[in-house]
A protein has these predicted regions:
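Short N-terminal amphipathic alpha-helices
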Residues: 41-46, 57-63, 437-445
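Generic amphipathic, hydrophobic interface segment in small proteins and small subunits
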Residues: 31-48
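Amphipathic alpha-helical scaffolding segments comprising HEAT/armadillo-like alpha-solenoid repeats
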Residues: 24-32, 55-74, 94-106, 125-136
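Structural detector for internal amphipathic alpha-helices that build alpha-solenoid repeat scaffolds
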Residues: 17-20, 43-59, 73, 80-95, ...
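N-terminal leader/presequence-like segments
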Residues: 1-2, 41
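Short inter-helical turns and helix N-cap capping residues of alpha-solenoid HEAT/ARM repeat scaffolds
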Residues: 38, 78-79, 108-111, 140
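Fe-S-dependent hydro-lyases/dehydratases of central metabolism
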Residues: 92, 98, 102, 107, ...
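Amphipathic alpha-helical packing elements
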Residues: 2-31, 36, 337-350
Length: 489
């Protein structure tokens, strides 16, 4: 396994990207090696276990979590990983298969404190919340400290806030960049492999952009040159992210401008995206990924410029300076974005806020004042369009009422359609969210884009994706069953 893995590492390094995360089979082999390590490989094996296994409810994560749980409980002896170390590693896996073992370990004298620390930063606990509360009610001190930490929002306050001022190096793409420039359709097959797919970003020559290999490999050398200046790179454009809604476009931008998610292989978050105009869906996808998207005049920002970005957290005013001179001013879309960035994304913020609310209710505490609340627009009494009423109905508003533009709301989705060029990415996102069952009434997966001329990766997807959807209570069509829209209608 190690020999084959090192060969894979070398092949990927030649492309300038990290190896793929470990598969279920590789993780099973790794677990066996950890219990009987070849001489000289000990540190490498622990590093692989720590950093190269996916988190959430991936198949490989299950193998890792089960092994660590056995070590932590003393059921398996492993000289390289102590009980406490195993518990700490369980605490880095975000949610899913690690949660139950961590809760079991709370009552253990040796590992209780370490498992409490892990759970304090784990948001994806879902129904296991009740197990922690039950333990706390029985007087378990570790469970009490977890509940108190969730109530205090420590998962949020221990993360860095958006800096009031930060230095950025500008990666400027003039004119309009659409999502096909960032995530080309002919490269759709590689989208779930974020670092590999990112090589195709901006691969076609355009003013100011120098692809390493025109039509095949994007401007990596140019980006490396900018990174050498030592600042975060900001993606800056005149019009950014128009066209088809593609999470893969955000993934590619973040691969070059974001930061690694700790303990999660080949995923990044954060980064700054500045555009004179940013397309709404792209803007939202950036928010989900913990980036800071800001609409601001980018006319005086040029490739390679070092700028200072100042954000006033009280008013949401944004100022961009070059050489100490103000070159543009703007306003954050909403102050809540500052919380989204701090939480590591809009989705972690929504889930985390919910967890904090639940914990405070369980402890009989008043609602938290930790988070910024969105300011919703006032109703001018002008009536609502049908679309506004439909969203209003999904948000539980009374009949005839609608949602105004600029309103913060969390609509309930009863029908979700997933098509196949994005299906594997959707699967990865669901794994990251520790999803073991869908709560929407209908989740349907189609195979209409790849049924006619499948590549090898598509054949593999046709084989594996249906069971992923159906085991979670979704409906999976078969290749050749027809177009997603006709089924949904």
């Amino acid at each position: 396994m190690l020999e084959a893995y090192r060969q894979h590492v070398a092949e990927r390094a030649a492309l300038g990207i990290p190896p793929l995360p470990l598969s279920k089979q590789q993780t099973q082999a790794l677990v066996e090696l950890l219990q009987n390590p070849p001489a000289g490989e000990e540190a490498f094996l622990v590093e692989l276990l720590t950093y190269r296994v996916p988190a959430g409810v991936d198949d490989a994560a299950k193998v890792k979590a089960e092994f660590l749980a056995k070590v932590a409980k003393g059921e398996v002896a492993c000289g390289l990983v102590s009980k406490v170390k195993a518990t700490e590693l369980l605490g880095t896996m975000l949610g899913g298969y690690n949660v139950k073992p961590l809760i079991d370990l709370l009552a253990n004298d040796e590992t209780g404190a370490a498992s409490a620390e892990g759970l304090k930063k784990t948001l994806l606990v879902f129904d296991f919340f009740h197990d922690v509360k039950e333990l706390a009610d029985k007087g378990n001190a570790n469970a009490k400290s977890v509940l108190q930490s969730w109530a205090d929002g420590e998962w949020f306050t221990t993360r860095p806030a958006v800096p009031a001022s930060q230095k950025l190096t500008v990666f400027k793409v003039t004119g309009e960049t659409n999502t096909d420039d960032l995530s080309p359709a002919p490269d759709a097959w590689s989208r779930p492999d974020i670092p590999l797919h990112a090589l195709a970003m901006l691969k076609n020559p355009r003013p100011g952009i120098e692809p390493d290999e025109a039509g095949a490999r994007g401007p990596l050398k140019q980006l490396e040159g900018l990174a050498a200046k030592g600042n975060l790179i900001a993606y800056v454009g005149d019009v950014v992210g128009t066209g088809s809604s593609r999470k893969s476009a955000t993934n590619s931008v973040l691969w070059f401008t974001g930061e690694d998610i700790p303990f999660v292989p080949n995923k990044r978050f954060g980064g700054v995206c500045l555009g004179s105009k940013i397309a709404p869906i792209f803007f939202n996808t950036m928010e989900d990924a913990g980036a800071l998207p800001i609409e601001i005049d980018a006319g005086q920002m040029d490739m390679g410029d070092e700028i200072e970005l100042q954000v006033d957290e009280a008013s949401g005013k944004v100022t961009a300076l070059k050489n100490g001179t103000v070159i543009a001013e703007s306003q954050l879309k909403t102050l809540v974005i500052l919380d989204e960035v701090r939480a590591g994304g809009r989705i972690p913020l929504i889930i985390g806020r919910g967890l904090t609310t639940k914990a405070r209710e369980a402890l009989g505490l008043p609602p938290s004042t930790l988070f910024r609340l969105p300011q919703n627009p006032a109703d001018a009494g002008t009536g609502y369009s049908l679309a506004q009423k439909m969203v209003g109905r999904a948000c539980g508003l009374p009949e005839g009422k609608g949602v105004l533009p600029g309103t913060y709301c969390e609509p309930k989705m009863t029908t979700v359609g997933s098509q196949d060029t994005t299906g594997p990415m959707t699967r990865d996102e669901l794994k990251d969210l520790a999803c073991l069952g869908f709560s929407a009434d209908l989740v349907m997966q189609s195979f209409c884009h790849t049924a006619a001329y499948p590549k090898l990766v598509d054949v593999k997807m046709h084989r594996e994706l249906p069971s992923f959807i159906s085991t979670r209570g979704g409906v999976s069509l078969r290749p050749g069953d027809g177009v997603i829209h006709s089924w949904l209608n």
